[in-house]
Design a protein with these regions (language model features):
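A generic structural micro-feature
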Residues: 4-8, 35, 83-89, 114-119
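N-terminal strand-loop-strand
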Residues: 1-38, 97
Length: 151
């Protein structure tokens, strides 16, 4: 009898809110689809969760963030969106930029020249107007609702 090893997909995301009470969103084209999500990504083996978020910030923004505090951890079973045989574990931290933003912030979603895998753009959205429907991924939808309710 062959026993399949459990598969977990650990994702770490940053909740970055500016002084105008706007939340930073990432619009990405990945795996041949458009998605709006919070900045962040996958935990690598041997990496702590806060370290993962700092690494993802350098990869996505090209600048450092400070991880402030824990916001939310997925506490129910959720299959991974893209890898249904894996269980998702999503962890969200509040974070802030160490220096003023040096990358382009757009005023419209999916502000890149073509729908090619790997393209990403960023925009601010008023926290009070944030809706679960703004987000693509199920757990991001839960977190968006929590953020809106706290506005």
């Amino acid at each position: 009898m062959t026993t399949k090893k459990p598969c977990f997909n650990v994702r770490v995301y940053g909740i970055i809110v500016n002084n105008k009470q706007q939340v930073l969103l990432a619009d990405e084209y990945q795996l041949n689809m458009k998605m709006t999500k919070f900045p962040g990504g996958g935990l690598q083996f041997g990496e702590g969760t806060a370290d993962c978020l700092r690494r993802e910030a350098m990869e996505e923004f090209g600048q450092e963030i400070e991880v402030l505090d824990h916001f939310y951890t997925l506490d129910y079973y959720q299959p991974s969106y893209f890898y249904k045989e894996c269980q998702l574990l999503s962890i969200y931290y509040r974070a802030r930029f160490v220096e003023p933003v040096r990358f382009v912030i757009s005023d419209r979603p999916f502000d890149f020249p073509s729908m090619d895998n790997g393209n990403i753009s960023f925009r601010w959205k008023d926290q009070a107007e944030l809706s679960p429907g703004d987000m693509t991924l199920p757990v991001d939808q839960v977190v968006a609702g929590m953020l809106r309710d706290q506005a």
